[in-house]
Design a protein with these regions (language model features):
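A Rossmann-like FAD-binding core segment of flavoenzymes
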Residues: 73-80, 174-282
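Internal hydrophobic alpha-helix adjacent to the cofactor/substrate pocket in enzyme cavities
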Residues: 174-177, 315-342
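Beta1-alpha1 glycine-rich phosphate/pyrophosphate-binding loop at the start
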Residues: 1-72, 166-204
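FAD-site-proximal beta/loop scaffold in flavoenzymes
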Residues: 118-150, 248-320
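FAD-binding core/adjacent interface of flavoenzyme oxidoreductases
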Residues: 1-3, 73-155, 159, 244, ...
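C-terminal auxiliary extensions adjacent to catalytic cores
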Residues: 350-396
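Short glycine-rich anion-binding loops that position phosphate/pyrophosphate groups of nucleotides
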Residues: 12, 105-108, 169, 260-262
């Protein structure tokens, strides 16, 4: 019986597991899922938790709900992978494998910017998101209760205006109103900045749609500064350079969304193949020269035949990678991995957004926001099952 070990219960890991459940139940394979936490969390909803608009429990799924007969779950942190001995070492266990699936997710990347890792909070996981939400409210409370009002306490700087940054800024539109009402603060005093070194906003959308997103945020009091090279961070500021001029923006809440990398364990395990925690896989998502090891999700840099660059790491491609690997390990004739890009949606809070989905269908406003929720509901179903999706309130 083939012994399959899956590292990580993210999108790719759980879709791999779902594809193996039938074979595991039939006793054709033995599956072990290893994850640091007892839960899976929806990375695509971390921005909502970070703003404080929803509790973290709303985006978490207990792993015990997805473990079925023939599947074992080990809650522990992976510290080493020995590819020669075919062993996974965690803090407590040694786990042998015949087939290994590595889906250990992403880590923040600050590109060596001075003070960034020490001072800015990344939207990296559930605990990080909860910290941002708590810091944001603590600072508003501090402003409201202090005799000497310091506007930096009700100021927020977001480094990065990619999808993660823009969606977080969209959530802040609602949260700002809520906190100002709660603590009796004039909304006009609040300063929120979205910074990016890029000259354009959301290049995956048409200019009409990216302009729509920018206008929505700016109409709600958020300042977008493009072409802003972020040079450093202090405990209460970002140092930026715009058109050759350096300036310091002050804020007590500093958030970083401008960079991610794959898991550092990738560089340690495959030093000659991995760069910034990502490994260029074969067309079957395996490690070159190691057909028994699959790389999926944020750790995988998949370059399709005929292309020059890897696809961006998204939940969409992670789900497709997991489904492919689960099918391939089960012995189904799947051929090479082919990614189907079904489009992109950017929410701007829970009532607005922009969307450009498969077939060139575009929408904006409330319709796009609802489309995002429908896509999220479908993703949870693909990861688990209908009952679990209902339990986690992802079916609308």
């Amino acid at each position: 019986m083939k012994n399959v070990v899956i590292l990580g219960a993210g999108y790719a890991g759980l879709t791999t597991l779902k594809g193996l459940k039938k074979a595991a139940k039939a006793g054709e394979v033995k599956v072990t899922l290893v994850n640091k936490n007892s839960y899976h969390y929806d990375t695509v909803n971390l921005h909502e938790v970070s703003a404080g608009n929803i509790p973290s429990r709303d985006i978490c799924i207990d792993i015990k709900d997805v473990v079925t007969p023939g599947v074992s779950f080990v809650q522990d942190e992976v510290i080493k992978i020995d590819t020669e001995k075919k062993l996974v070492l965690t803090k407590k266990y040694e786990i042998d494998y015949d087939v290994l699936v590595i889906g250990l997710g992403f880590q923040p990347e600050t590109f060596g910017i001075e003070g960034m890792a020490e001072n800015a909070m990344p939207i990296a996981n559930v605990l990080a998101a909860e910290k941002i939400a708590a810091t944001l409210e603590d600072n508003f409370r501090k402003y409201a209760t202090s005799e000497e009002k310091d506007v930096k306490d009700i100021s927020v700087i977001v480094g990065g205006t990619g999808l993660a940054g823009m969606e977080f800024l969209g959530e802040l539109v609602h949260r700002k109103k809520e906190l100002c009402s709660k603590y009796g603060i004039d909304e006009k005093l609040v300063k929120i900045y979205g910074l990016d070194a890029a000259p354009t906003l959301l290049p995956m959308f048409t200019k009409e749609y990216s302009d729509y997103a920018r206008k929505y945020l700016e109409d709600n009091g958020i300042e977008i500064i493009l072409g802003a090279g972020i040079k450093g961070a202090t405990a209460d500021s970002f140092i930026i350079e715009v058109d050759g001029e350096r300036k310091e923006l002050k804020a007590s809440t500093l958030v970083w969304t401008a960079g991610v990398r794959g898991n550092k364990l990738m560089d340690e395990t495959f030093p000659e193949l991995s760069k910034r925690g990502r490994l260029v896989t074969t067309q079957q998502l395996t490690v070159p020269g190691m057909e028994d090891i699959y790389i999926v999700g944020d750790c995988a840099a998949f370059i399709e035949t005929g292309q020059e660059r890897p696809y961006p790491t998204t939940a969409q491609i992670a789900n497709q990678m997991g489904a492919y690997v689960g099918a391939r390990i089960s012995g189904k004739p799947v051929g090479d991995f082919k990614y189907i890009n079904r489009g992109v949606v950017c929410s701007l809070g829970h009532k607005d957004g922009i969307a450009d989905v498969m077939g060139g269908k575009k929408s904006k406003g409330f319709k796009a926001a609802k489309l995002k929720k429908i896509i999220e509901a479908k993703a949870i179903y693909e990861l688990t099952d209908f009952v679990t999706a209902l339990k986690n309130q992802r079916i609308l």
